[in-house]
Amino acid sequence: MTDFLDRRRFLGACSATIAALVVPSQRAFALPASPHPTPRPGITGAKVLTADKLADRPRLVSLFDSIRKIPEVVDGIHCNCGCTNPPELYSLLSCYENGMARDCAICQGQGRLAVRLHGEGKTLDEIRAAIDAKFG
């Protein structure tokens, strides 16, 4: 029996170490949870990016279309990636209006979760709690 690592074990150990140290999870970049905003009266999904603005990201079209259908829910959710920190950005809905959600996995993840839970009949408070548990 030898006391040294063969090449396969060495590369496996190196890969695991690099992954643990260098590849941070999305949650590592998420900011501490802030209070969720109150959905604005009369808010619509009219400003959510449409398929023509997502031509280079066709896999996101259905997500943006789904967000457009539930603006009163998504406008009541704080985005945990930090994009709603500038004063002109109010809620997770803002991320889908200004295009931040095109490239941000946290915005997309929160949006997908909100759409799924809303489809299951969950209330805004239940959706917020689930988002806080996963992303907060």
Feature map (PLM): residue ranges:
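N-terminal secretory signal peptides and thylakoid transit peptides that target proteins
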Residues: M1-L21
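Immediate flanking context of iron-sulfur cluster ligation sites
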Residues: F64-C79, Y90-G99
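Iron-sulfur (Fe-S) cluster-binding segments and ferredoxin-like electron-carrier domains
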Residues: N85-E120
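Mitochondrial intermembrane space
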Residues: R40, G45, Y90-S91, F135-G136
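C-terminal segment of N-terminal export signals and the immediately downstream linker at the start
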Residues: P24-S62
